[in-house]
Amino acid sequence: MKEKKIMALADENIMNTYRRVPIALVKGEGARLWDANGKEYLDFVAGIAVCNLGHSHPNVVKAIKKQAKNLMHVSNLYYTRPQGEVASILTKHSFADKVFFCNSGAEANEAAIKLARKYAHENLGEDKFELITMKDSFHGRTMATITATGQEKFQFGFTPLLDGFKYVPFNDPAALEDAITPKTCGIMLEPIQGEGGVIIPDDRYLAKVRDICDRHRILMIVDEV
């Protein structure tokens, strides 16, 4: 199919939620992409940081083929060997004791927000429901995650936002401490801000956030890809 026809088909049938670059990609190998006209590109986007192994990696293709021959999706109502094996690898190589599998960063953040409020309800009291997030942050495009996002440009057109969120400057432990109230249940932040313009905090900032959370018995939510 020619490039113009590919783009026309998409424009006619897919909701216009992205400002697309006018090229139609048809093939990838490693860090390289080709469009429908045969033009080659270097892929620095990596599916917005989710395809870091590149395109058509032989080991990835082999694993997908193997799994497709055995089982497709069966839901979390049942046990499967690969799910447990991957979870075990993740827990052994991270701080985590448990893993929650989901489909997107926004879904992960939604779950984290729910977990923070659930934790507070069961351990601190039902009046503790507020989350503190950072100005110039980005946490997703669902209702809860655009509310958590500290940028008005992502919230425009979707008000009223959800209750229970407040924003403080990134890399400012004093402002964070001042923002905590008897209703606070957690602090949510990116270790390095991306959408706000690659902002790296001071070396001790995250340790100070951890200390603040521990002292107030609230959860620290780290949004990292």
For each of these PLM feature ranges, what is it?
Residues 1-29:
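Active-site-adjacent loop/helix segments that line or gate small-molecule/cofactor pockets in enzymes
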Residues 184-198:
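Short acidic, glycine-rich surface-loop motifs adjacent to enzyme active sites
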Residues 39, 186, 219-220:
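Hydrophobic "anchor" residues on beta-strands that sit immediately upstream
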Residues 10, 14, 18, 68, ...:
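Structural signal for hydrophobic packing residues in well-ordered secondary-structure cores
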Residues 40-126:
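Glycine-rich loop-to-alpha-helix module at the N-terminal edge of alpha/beta enzyme cores
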